[in-house]
Amino acid sequence: MKNSGFIASALLAIIIVGGCATSDYGRITDKIAAYEVQAVTAREKLQSANSQAKITLYRTLVSIYTNQLTIARRINPESNPAYKSGSITLEQAKTEKNDRVATLEKQLEKALKDRDGLVIEIATPAAK
């Protein structure tokens, strides 16, 4: 498990450094991808964590998804390389952005719901 954290950190660094040489669109999408690496690591840890640790991991996921969502909303569809090259229309670029934002909103909503459910489960004494 320790190696997965190291690998995730290395991938995060590569993605961030790689994003520095690309367009604004590329930097923004690279940041979203870098956060996704962190989210994958947190989701992996959820599988074997105890209840208290899960709450912390859900907080981490909520923070990651919130950051991704904030960044995704800043995407300018006109800076999409596919739009600039003419392979998609502006409407398709806008749809792509909206789909990405909607997906991130669903992930955030699910993490919040799962976290709240776990908090209620922990707070509710077991029925005897």
Region locations from a protein language model:
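Generic detector of low-complexity/intrinsically disordered segments
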Residues: 13-14, 48, 110, 120
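Intrinsically disordered, glycine/charged-rich N-terminal periplasmic/extracytoplasmic linker segments
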Residues: 54-128
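Immediate post-signal-peptide N-terminus of mature secreted/exported proteins
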Residues: 20-63
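Intrinsically disordered and other compositionally biased segments
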Residues: 6-7, 45, 49, 98-101
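Sec-dependent bacterial lipoprotein signal peptides
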Residues: 1-21
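Generic alpha-helix initiation/capping and coil-helix boundary signal
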Residues: 1-6, 32-35, 65, 86, ...
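Intrinsic-disorder/low-complexity regions
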Residues: 2, 23, 29, 49, ...
